[in-house]
Swiss-Prot record:
Subcellular location: Cytoplasm
UniProt keyword annotation of Protein biosynthesis present: yes
Family stated for the protein in its record: Belongs to the RRF family.
Main location: cytoplasm
Biological classification of the source: Bacteria, Pseudomonadati, Pseudomonadota, Betaproteobacteria, Nitrosomonadales
A Gene Ontology BP annotation from the UniProt entry: cytoplasmic translational termination
Keyword annotations from UniProtKB, A to Z: Cytoplasm, Protein biosynthesis
GO molecular function, one term: ribosomal large subunit binding
Species name: Thiobacillus denitrificans (strain ATCC 25259 / T1)
Gene transcribed to yield this protein: frr
Function of the protein: Responsible for the release of ribosomes from messenger RNA at the termination of protein biosynthesis. May increase the efficiency of translation by recycling ribosomes from one round of translation to another.
Top-level lineage group: Bacteria
Stored CDD domains: RRF
NCBIfam families linked to this entry: frr (TIGR00496)
Protein's name according to its UniProt entry: Ribosome-recycling factor
Length: 189
């Protein structure tokens, strides 16, 4: 009985750490590098009949070239709203409307903007590291509770803490790797 509970704690910790890593991957994808990619507008919300809706749900977002996106709304009356949402978003983009197509040029990143974005990415990564460490802390607290309740021995607790620590190290290593890749992307001119 005690083994399955310890296994549950390890599996739960690994699952939560995996979700933290996935969340970081999504957060890093939002940070704009100099290149255009359709996913950059996924988190820009436009008012669609009173509901905040992601741009890709109300328009076709495509790559015109490596530094320009084309946004073609499904409904012509949405052109102005989508353009305003993109402009007001915190991505620093300046869309231009040509008929019923919105062109979104990706401005080249200035050195100062690159430094700012690197700070943002480092903060995101640090937040993920903290989350992983908190998951480790919670797992260790659960183990201590099991020892107090006499459903696990102190040896099992120590062994499992070591395994959870190895998991923590593995996920923090992944976070550092993702951060290094994103920084390299941002510094590439």
């Amino acid at each position: 009985m005690a083994e399955t509970t310890i296994t549950d704690i390890k599996q739960s910790a690994e699952q939560k750490m995996g979700k933290t890593l996935e969340a970081l991957k999504n957060d890093l994808a939002k940070v704009r590098t100099g290149r255009a990619h359709a996913g950059i507008l996924d988190h820009v919300l436009v008012d669609y009949y009173g509901n905040p809706t992601p741009v890709p749900q109300v328009a076709n977002v495509s790559l015109v070239d490596s530094r320009t996106l084309g946004v073609q709304p499904y409904e012509k009356n949405m052109v102005g709203k989508i353009e305003k949402a993109i402009r007001d978003g915190d991505l620093g983009l300046n869309p231009a409307t040509h008929g019923d197509v919105i062109r979104v040029p990706m401005p080249a990143l200035t050195e100062e903007r690159r430094r700012d974005l690197i700070k943002v990415v480092r903060n995101e990564a640090e937040g993920a590291r903290v989350a992983v460490r908190n998951i480790r802390r919670d797992a260790n607290a659960s183990l201590k509770d099991m020892v107090k309740a006499k459903t696990a021995t102190e040896d099992e607790e120590r062994r499992t803490q070591d395994e959870v620590q190895k998991l923590t190290d593995k996920f923090i290593g992944e976070i550092d790797k993702m951060l290094a890749e994103k920084e390299k992307d941002l510094l590439a001119v």
